[in-house]
Amino acid sequence: MGNIVAIVGRPNVGKSTFFNRLIQRREAIIDSVSGVTRDRHYGKSDWNGKKFSLIDTGGYVKGSDDIFEAEIDKQVELAIDEADAIIFIVDVESGVTSMDEEVANLLRRVNKPVLLAVNKVDNNKRLANAVEFYSLGLGEYFPIASTNGSGTGDLLDALIEALPEIEEEDESELPRFAVVGRPNAGKSSFINALIGEDRYIVTDIAGTTRDSIDTRYNRFGFEFNLVDTAGIRRKSKVKENLEFYSVMRSVRAIENCDVCLVVLDATRGFDGQVQNIFWLAQRNHKGIVILVNKWDLVDKETNTMKEYEAMIRREIEPFTDVPIVFISVLTKQRVFKAIETAVKVFESRSKKIKTRQFNDVMLPIIERNPPPAYKGKYVKIKFCMQLPTPHPQFAFFCNLPQYVRDPYKRFLENKLRQEFDFQGVPISIFFRKK
């Protein structure tokens, strides 16, 4: 898992423009994850070979442009707690404002790398004016212009130099199942229901990520780590920024796990915040199991469960091949079924299909249902294979890969899932020139 870098600053200084500038740079960004919020506020980055996750905290600030300083302070405090480094963006046009000084006061008190970026420096006059930001007491500043990218390379070079080293994960480590979801959905209670009276627990160890607890657990003859990141922070610090807090915690948990157990509160439904976490897990290619908790509190009729499940699948389209387990941590209803399902998803995600077997199954399907002609030309797929990657990826070799349209790609994915059982596992399909 890479470091987390938070972009902070008051409204209208160019945080989102700076973020968008970075995620459009192919040499810097290896993947941009949409769906974390309605706008794109989360990206996985790689600058000069160093990976980190970039979060634009500006997207989590509520209210109008003249938002209260107290709310800005809470947002910045959360970023300080969760991030490994912070980029503080100010606006040379406005000069040093009282809100800038308030944020700087917070940042000076932390023992983490803080990089001061003076934005909108696009001419020599503004370059000279940027000197006044020395008064914030944060040391060297970096003049940048988010609109054209000027200065961002120097800033990123300094960021990489400042980021703490993170030990690479040992591939021989036990599988990690992360319990994620919005606050108060029952994440910690779910783990407590599993371990409270269970004699299969081996030990509790400090997690590799800050504030997480890894519980080494053995069930169904399968040993793994349960990762709980919930209920650790003081509620008084997060009650005004629950969505920001939840996503920040989920980023760490999801990037460092194999399977995500996404817990939702049955009385609240599959809301936007749960959807954000679901898409975050999907775009990180993690196995996914959805747990509908507090099912004992829902008034039920004959088809209540079926209708609730259908509602969830509509919300997560087009990736609907995900197991959904209805549980109650209070009564321990189906809590072990949830773990059994997560183990199956992990095994599916780790599955390796032999090339000959894969071709024997898929090529006859393709022959019966070939890709539609495009611009009068026919695509002929002659060979396919699973790629040697940590999560399932498949390559189909053909004469005209550029002419394969998305509907046919979805058709192949559906057939793959039917034939090889990849429930709960995001898969990637590529078409390559033979």
Swiss-Prot record:
GTP 2 binds at residues 181-188, 228-232, 293-296. The keyword Repeat applies. The keyword Nucleotide-binding applies. It holds the Pfam family MMR_HSR1. GTP 1 binds at residues 9-16, 56-60, 119-122. Keywords: GTP-binding, Nucleotide-binding, Repeat, Ribosome biogenesis. GO terms for molecular function: GTP binding; ribosome binding. This is GTPase Der. It comes from Christiangramia forsetii (strain DSM 17595 / CGMCC 1.15422 / KT0803) (Gramella forsetii). The lineage of its organism: Bacteria, Pseudomonadati, Bacteroidota, Flavobacteriia, Flavobacteriales.
